Every structure is written in C-alpha cells, then in structure tokens.
C-alpha cells in the first residue's frame, strides 16, 4: 500500500469538495461577475484592490480552484510513477485531471463569453465527476489489491443506471439555480400557484426527478439486500441517508431556507451521494472483470 500517496489523494479529494462548495457560494451569491469579464486576472489585476464582497467570493474561488488544479497534476504524476502496475488507479488520476481542466475551461468561458444557463449548469456536474474520480482513486489506494464479493449482472446494471440518472437529476438542479427558478414554485412538494411559468415547470420537473431518484435508490438497496451483497448494501444505505437529507434541504430552501449555507448543504449532500454511488458502480464493474479474468484463466489452464 502507498500510504503517503493515499493520504495525499485524500487531501486533494477534500480540496475538490471545497472547490465545489465555493462554486456553489459563487452561484448562490450571484458573484460570477465579481471580477468583471477578466480571466484569470480580476478587474485587470493579479490581486484586486478595494474588492467588493462579490469580488472576494469569486476571486477566492479562482485561487482555491487554481491550487486544487496544481495538486491534482501533482497527484496524477505521483500516481503514474508510484503505482505502475495498476491501470485503474492511473485512469482515475487522469480522469480527475481531465474533468478539472474541462471544469476550469467552462468557468473561464462563463466569465469571458457569458455562457447560457444550460451550459453553466454543466459546470457543477463536471466538477462532481472530478471529485468522484478522486474519491475512487483514494479508496483504491487505501484498499490495495484486496478481493471483493462478485456483483450480479442485474445489480451491476442498476448501479450504472442509477449513476447515470443521478447525473441527469444533478444537471436539472444546477439548471434550476442558474435559471433563477429556485423560488419559481409556491409550496412543496407540488407547485400550488395558478399561473405556471417556464421556471415553474423546470422547478417542478426537478422535484419529480428527485423523487424518482429516491425511489430508484430504495430499489437498488432492496436488490443489494436480496443478493446479500454486504458492501453494496452498506454503501446504498449511506446513499439513501444522503439523498433523503438532500430532499429535505431542497424542501427547506423552498419553504424558507434563504440563508447561504442551506443550498451549500444541498450541494454537499449530493456530492457525498454521488461519490459513494460512483465507487459502488466501479466496484461492481471491477468485481465482474476479475470474475471474467478468473474464468478465462481456468479455461486456458
């Protein structure tokens, strides 16, 4: 086991979580234009003078994101040098870097070219994939070459499906924020106003999809229990905990949670949920690949 590398990877993963939360703060406080249309400079300067609150929020997000990007590069290089025999570990280090790079490009584009709400909504989801890649990398480094229980094809397929569907729900949630549709509905869980706007339909659509996500999570947990797969079952129980809290904070936002920390908690919970789900999905893929490899070895033996 590469302990130092594993702990460093864990530190970088926490850094990515901080980047996600700070990005949510930028969106919540409408600070995306806090540095004007300059990037990477802020109002034409390396360090802004007499900054407003919005400028400080946007500038600090850029600084932390830049430091995190350098840490991810260092982690990827260290991983490629130290863990030459593990292709999967190197792949996740590479994915973390690539998605961090894409996220930075979209962030810069939002400042310079004023992207549409539909494009801006991709920003959080891409950052989420980078975080999940770092989390999986960290877990793999701590695990070493440990063997795990094989996951059935049905359970594996539903884990993949749940992961993909989660990304769609995450996108709709980000679109709600960037569209300014957070308070487009009166009441919860159903929009109770007589006149519905486009923003109301977007908000209600996100609620319906989030409700289905909870049901799908329950179903995958049921499958894991039925097949007595303890690792998947424990992981899905943790996922259910986070998604229920996620729905609760969503209702809190609509019903009066106007404080900045409430939507940030909302983003934190879905990040934890997706991180766990991503690892379980890869675990399912990995266990199947090892089973196929063992069968092929027996046939050739």
From Swiss-Prot:
Pathway: Porphyrin-containing compound metabolism; heme A biosynthesis; heme A from heme O: step 1/1. Residues 27-62, 112-121, 180-203, 256-259 are extracellular. Its cofactor is heme b. InterPro entries: COX15/CtaA_fam, COX15/CtaA_HemeA_synthase, HemeA_Synthase_type1. Disulfide bonds join 35-42, 185-191. Heme b binds at residues 206, 266. Keywords: Cell membrane, Disulfide bond, Heme biosynthesis, Iron, Membrane, Metal-binding, Oxidoreductase, Transmembrane, Transmembrane helix. GO terms for molecular function: metal ion binding; oxidoreductase activity, acting on NAD(P)H, heme protein as acceptor. Its EC number is 1.17.99.9. Its main location: membrane. Residues 1-5, 84-90, 143-158, 225-234, 281-301 are cytoplasmic. It is found in: Cell membrane. Heme o binds at residues 61, 123. It catalyses: Fe(II)-heme o + 2 A + H2O = Fe(II)-heme a + 2 AH2. One of its GO terms (biological process) is heme A biosynthetic process. Catalyzes the conversion of heme O to heme A by two successive hydroxylations of the methyl group at C8. The first hydroxylation forms heme I, the second hydroxylation results in an unstable dihydroxymethyl group, which spontaneously dehydrates, resulting in the formyl group of heme A. Interacts with CtaB. Belongs to the COX15/CtaA family. Type 1 subfamily. The N-half (TM1-TM4) and C-half (TM5-TM8) domains are connected by an intracellular loop. Each domain is formed from four-helix bundles and they align in a pseudo twofold symmetry manner. The N-half domain is the substrate-heme O binding domain and the C-half domain is the cofactor heme B binding domain. This is Heme A synthase. It comes from Exiguobacterium sp. (strain ATCC BAA-1283 / AT1b). The gene is ctaA.
